[in-house]
Design a protein with these regions (language model features):
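Short beta-strand scaffold segments in enzyme catalytic cores
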Residues: 20-25, 216-220
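Glycine-rich beta-strand-to-loop/alpha-helix junction loops that act as flexible
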Residues: 81-86, 323-333
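Hydrophobic, well-ordered secondary-structure elements that form the walls
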Residues: 308, 327, 375
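Nucleotide/phosphate-binding catalytic cleft detector across ATP-hydrolyzing
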Residues: 1-17, 23-208, 225-226, 236, ...
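Conserved structured catalytic cores and adjacent interaction surfaces
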Residues: 205-207, 219, 224-227, 231, ...
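A general structural motif
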Residues: 300-309
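Short glycine/threonine-rich loop-to-helix capping motif typified by GTGT followed
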Residues: 198-200, 330-344
Length: 411
């Protein structure tokens, strides 16, 4: 087997509130991505998706990366890192320019996107992504690839995502402290959408709900493009905390109980099935009905799903997501959650498992790895885009140019 070279390796680094996951993918000759290494380590230095302790975060990243390197038999030099947290903001914008030579060139696309990004954002926020939704040429709508088309006026509709400068700088700082470079920083639900959604769903209209430990991340797609993103600061950690308080058990045992026995719909939990609950201090463990646990878990998940529904309504896209809801993320793997979500949303709901990769498929087909696999796929698409831009000459701004603002004067 040929030795893996740095050139055909991609690494996704999902720095989450409850765990750090590193996934190594090798780009194969047939342009598929084979997952060759996975590393995971509990995360201690983040709260609600934001770094609060650099040393702890660095330690978690190092352990996850070392495990992935060992499995893949390679050395990791750079990563695509995810970003989340309630500091994330998003808005839809548009720009208009005149087409110089009556035919759209890559430079015209760059100018119209620059025009679309010319909106006032707070000084403590930086643009993370400018995601084109569609282009219009002389009022002709629905154009995805304008280069080469004729016209005199070019418009762009874009979705802009911004994040706190300090939050992004701290992620970069933690990764660099591990001796690694950051290829790009990607919004986590955008990454997850690459691995769990189909093109048909994005065309028809879909709402992705990525339930992690610290945050629940939402992304809405219609007509093949991203239309709305949001972050809700309630997720799996709140469920764990509810279990710990209600059952009077230490947090680490509450997390284990949630993973093994939790059910999000009380009517699906048997009243006859008992579970053992460790007590605080040196008190003896107790036995409780699994039904009792479900009575603790269901209200929190119902509250979370109601907040997602309220956000979807506020965005104005609730009636446009004909394909329904896709749940993913580590805290979506709870029995009865899909059924509860169908009751709340009154639309089809499915669990999103990572796809579009080969290799360690049995391991990665788990919602826990949705963001990690998505970061690989985003990285690959991005790399292909840069090759295309290099061929076109004057293309859109490179990732490095786009990210320079994060680094300058900060280290």
């Amino acid at each position: 087997m040929p030795k893996k070279t740095e050139k055909n390796l991609l690494v996704g680094l999902d720095i989450g509130t409850s765990k750090v996951v590193a996934i190594v993918g090798e780009v194969m000759p047939d342009a598929t991505i084979e997952v060759v290494g996975i590393g995971s380590h509990p995360s201690r230095g983040l709260k609600k998706g934001v770094v609060v302790n650099i040393e702890s975060t660095v330690h978690s990243i190092q352990r996850a990366v070392e495990e992935a390197e060992l499995m893949a038999g390679c050395q990791i030099h750079s990563v695509y890192a995810g970003i989340a947290g309630s500091h994330i903001r998003s808005l839809n914008s548009h720009g208009i320019v005149a087409i110089k030579d009556k035919e759209v060139l890559p430079g015209d696309v760059e100018r119209v996107i620059d025009a679309a990004r010319a909106v006032a954002i707070p000084a403590d926020q930086k643009i993370l992504h400018i995601l084109p939704q569609e282009f219009l040429i002389d009022n002709q709508e629905g154009i995805k690839e304008p280069v080469g088309m004729s016209g005199v006026r070019l418009e762009a509709k874009v979705h802009m995502v911004t994040g706190a400068v300090s939050a992004a700088q701290n992620i970069i700082k933690c990764v660099r402290r591990c001796g690694l470079e950051v290829d790009d920083i990607i919004l986590e639900q955008l990454a997850s959408s690459y691995s769990v959604l189909t093109d048909d769903e994005k065309d028809l209209g879909i709402c992705l709900v990525d339930i992690g430990g610290g945050t629940t991340d939402i992304a809405v797609f219609t007509e093949g493009s991203i239309r709305h993103t949001a972050v809700i600061p309630i997720a799996g950690d709140q469920v764990t905390n509810d279990i710990a308080v209600a059952l009077r058990t230490p947090t680490q045992f509450a997390e284990e109980i949630k993973i093994k026995y939790a059910c999000a719909l009380t009517q699906m939990a048997s009243a006859d099935e008992n579970i053992e609950v460790p007590s605080v201090g040196d008190r003896a463990p107790r036995r409780l009905a699994r039904h009792t646990l479900a009575e603790v878990v269901e209200p929190r998940y119902e509250e979370l799903l109601s907040l997602v529904q309220a956000e979807l309504r506020r965005s104005g896209f609730e009636d446009l997501v004909a394909a329904g809801i896709v749940l993913t993320g580590g805290s979506s793997k709870i029995e009865g959650l899909v059924e509860l979500a169908e009751e709340v949303f009154h639309m089809p709901v499915r669990l999103g498992l990572p796809q579009y990769v080969t290799g360690l498929v049995d391991v990665v087909r788990n919602p826990i790895y949705a963001t990690g696999v998505g970061l690989l796929l985003f990285g690959y698409n991005n790399r292909e885009q840069r090759v295309l831009e290099a061929g076109l000459g004057k293309g859109l701004k490179s990732v490095w140019e786009r990210m320079k603002g994060w680094f300058q004067g900060n280290f």
